[in-house]
Amino acid sequence: MKPTFRPHRKKRARKIGYRARMATASGRKVIKSRRLKGRKRLTVV
């Protein structure tokens, strides 16, 4: 069997990076809630 998780930084950033989050209303809500919670890192990568 092949491994199910094959990490790629570029793919991850494009899907769940800061700019990807800011592109949609729900993504902006995610960033906002993480800011309000006091997260040190708003997005992964």
Swiss-Prot record:
GO terms for cellular component: ribonucleoprotein complex; ribosome. It holds the Pfam family Ribosomal_L34. InterPro entries: Ribosomal_bL34. The keyword Ribosomal protein applies. Disulfide bonds: none annotated. Keywords: Ribonucleoprotein, Ribosomal protein. One of its GO terms (biological process) is translation. One of its GO terms (molecular function) is structural constituent of ribosome. The keyword Ribosomal protein applies. Gene3D superfamilies: 1.10.287.3980. Belongs to the bacterial ribosomal protein bL34 family. HAMAP family: Ribosomal_bL34 (MF_00391). This is Large ribosomal subunit protein bL34. It comes from Opitutus terrae (strain DSM 11246 / JCM 15787 / PB90-1). The gene is rpmH.
